[in-house]
Each structure stands twice: as C-alpha cells, then as structure tokens.
C-alpha cells in the first residue's frame, strides 16, 4: 500500500523548499525512504512476496542514485538530508 495523501503532504512540507516543491532531490529521497520503511514492515509479515520485493529493490536503487546525484551537486544538503532521515551513510 502506498503512502496516504496526508503523509506525502507532510513529507513535502518538511523537506521541500516551498509548498509545491515535489520534485527536488530531498523530497524525492524522503518520499522513497518513507515508502521503503513502510514496505520493510510488510516483508516482516509476508516473507515470500517476491513481486513486491523487486519493487522495493527498485526503490532502493532509485534512492541511491538520487543520493549520489545530491552528493555530487551539494555536499552540505546531502549531509543534512542523511542526518534528518537517519540513513547510515
């Protein structure tokens, strides 16, 4: 199940530069992180759901690419985002 409209709006408000900023790298990474965290709970219950696991791996790969792009463009924004999201890098 995907994130609710309210949850997405809260993430956009927290990580975006404006109210309609849905395309910045920070917002995209934050949305992907929320979806990944939601799916991790799903997999603790449904261990053999390989179809959804493929989607999860795709999301993780997309997030990794966005983080690499952000790190190349602006290291300070990258470090701030990693800290705010609690990612390990």
UniProtKB/Swiss-Prot annotation:
- Supply one GO molecular-function term: structural constituent of ribosome
Q: What does the entry give for GO biological process? A: translation
Cite the InterPro entries for this sequence: Ribosomal_uS15, Ribosomal_uS15_bac-type, uS15_NS1_RNA-bd_sf
Keyword line: Ribonucleoprotein, Ribosomal protein, RNA-binding, rRNA-binding
- Going by the entry's taxonomy, the superkingdom of the source organism is recorded as Bacteria
One Pfam family matching this protein: Ribosomal_S15
Query: Do you know which SUPFAM superfamilies this protein is assigned to?
Result: S15/NS1 RNA-binding domain
One Gene Ontology CC term in the entry? cytosolic small ribosomal subunit
Tell me the function of this protein.
One of the primary rRNA binding proteins, it binds directly to 16S rRNA where it helps nucleate assembly of the platform of the 30S subunit by binding and bridging several RNA helices of the 16S rRNA. Forms an intersubunit bridge (bridge B4) with the 23S rRNA of the 50S subunit in the ribosome.
Assembly state and interactors? Part of the 30S ribosomal subunit. Forms a bridge to the 50S subunit in the 70S ribosome, contacting the 23S rRNA.
**According to its UniProt record, which protein family does this protein belong to?**
Belongs to the universal ribosomal protein uS15 family.
Q: What is this protein called?
A: Small ribosomal subunit protein uS15
């Amino acid at each position: 199940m995907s994130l609710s409209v309210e949850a997405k709006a809260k993430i956009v408000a927290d990580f975006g530069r404006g109210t309609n900023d849905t395309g910045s790298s920070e917002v995209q990474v934050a949305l992907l992180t929320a979806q990944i965290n939601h799916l991790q709970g799903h997999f603790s219950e449904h261990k053999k759901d390989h179809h959804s696991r493929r989607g999860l791996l795709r999301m993780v790969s997309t997030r990794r690419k966005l983080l690499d792009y952000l790190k190349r463009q602006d290291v300070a924004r990258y470090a701030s985002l990693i800290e705010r999201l609690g990612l390990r890098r």
